């Protein structure tokens, strides 16, 4: 979901892919704070060099290939470059437009608002869309996108408050959470689902007061991380928090709420944080976050990387 925000920082040189608009990404550091999660570093993505912004969801695989989608219906893939464990830049990007079932690129506007991304064990990509609420399945992101059975009731979501979080859980089920589809009996709860085609089960998720869910990622233990965002113009603009939801909470009938792991700020810069990804890296879990600049010169497209003992 689009928001307004902070001033864009000037870009400088970096050891990463160079395009007509300059380097694709510029590294910067994140201050370490007490807590279970250790910051490894961050990148500012040069959307002029990339050709678009609006990055709304991401995936980082075991080979450190970063995949992201945009709410303008575009996608890109690039290798995450490291110096030791520190993000140093991005390799050359492959980009494209998401397509419909016939292979035609999605029409501009309402059909292109891609907000959620998950990868199934067989490599299929699932992309969740707002405004026209639906899920499409892609064998590869440059292939036609077939309709994937959406959770029952998703069509009732507000136009700009639909499916923001779509995560593959360790047991093969999907976790789907809406941004602003309230529970009819309790407006502090958001409607969501766990399961898949033919097995969707409704759940209720409780974000922190004033926050909205923007993404989720499954954990190896069967739980999940959920990213929540808040925008309050008179209180400094954006803030976000990353919470851990236990596997037991996802199995039970009660409303789901998470245990905070990160608060942004102070655990990282204030921005429009929209995407989260998790991968196992040695003994630690690496957590990646991405922000959506809304293709607005006063906001930034940032990627941050953290290590967590889990």
Set out the residue ranges of the language-model regions.
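Sequence/structural signature of beta-propeller domains
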Residues: 7-310
